[in-house]
Regions:
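Bacterial N-terminal signal peptides that target proteins for export
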Residues: 1-9
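Bacterial N-terminal signal peptides
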Residues: 8-18
Length: 256
């Protein structure tokens, strides 16, 4: 009887691993709708051999990309990001973790963060899904730490959109003089607004982070964007002062 119970437990364990592996693989594959829309899967769910470069500190495991030590960002070198594009990805963090997705030359970063613990979560302009140190999301749409979030970046012309878990949280047109202060912040950090042709980069910030379902497509010239505007979250006065000092430090370090 005992041997039979052990055998049954082993079978269920194997089935569980198989189901887990199957589910992990399926999220990295293109759906029919994604294929029809022109998406390309950048991560195959098995390894990082299809164009990803790193210094031995990233790995693919159980259908997920994760870092396993310091060494720098994970960069997709097989092709550059198109001028007008849509990028989808899933991400999750551990308690206090920080990472980011870089998608245009300079400091265009979709912030990846545990808002509740990391210090950057105190400032909406550096919180999860922000255009880091430029534009705050309209609200905190993150899921609890340890759960998967769905990120999405849409860029066409001068319009930049950040989405999180199905909600558009940033709609930013950098040709609009309304956002001059925000644009100045981005440029001080090194972003070149008209520049295009970056390689997708997943930031190593020294913290545990996981990515999967990384999918990219070129936006057709005749495709219309969701133009509904969203307003960035308000930032408290004391947080703005801390932000000013932090930006000053960043600028000074860049001068050295």
């Amino acid at each position: 009887m005992r041997n039979r119970l052990i055998l049954v437990a082993a079978v269920f364990s194997i089935l569980g691993l198989t189901i887990q592996s199957s589910n992990a693989g399926s999220v990295n594959e293109l759906s029919e709708a994604e294929s029809a829309a022109g998406f390309e899967a950048l991560f195959n769910g098995r390894n990082l051999d299809n164009g990803w470069e790193h210094k031995g500190n990233w790995k693919a495991e159980n259908g997920v990309v994760t870092r396993e030590g310091k060494g720098g960002s994970l960069v997709y070198k097989a092709k550059k990001i198109p001028d007008d594009f849509e990028l989808k990805f899933q991400w999750k963090v551990a308690k206090g973790s920080n990472s980011g997705v870089y998608y245009r030359p300079g400091q265009y970063e979709y912030q990846i963060l545990d808002n509740g613990v990391h210090n950057d979560g105190k400032n909406p302009r550096t919180s999860a899904a922000s255009l880091y140190f430029c534009m705050a999301p309209s609200h905190d749409a993150t899921k609890p730490v340890g759960e998967w979030n769905e990120g999405r970046i849409v860029c066409k012309g001068t319009i930049i959109q950040h989405w999180l878990n199905g909600k558009k949280v940033i709609h930013f047109d950098y040709s609009d003089s309304k956002w001059k202060f925000n644009i100045d912040m981005l440029e001080k950090r090194g972003a070149k607004l008209p520049a295009r042709g970056a390689h997708l980069s997943l930031q190593d910030h020294g913290d545990p982070v996981w990515y999967r379902a990384i999918k990219l497509r070129t936006l057709p010239a005749d495709e219309k964007l969701d133009v509904k505007k969203v307003e960035p979250a308000k930032i408290a006065a004391d947080v703005l002062e801390a932000e000013r000092k932090k930006l000053e430090g960043i600028v000074n370090r860049r001068k050295k």
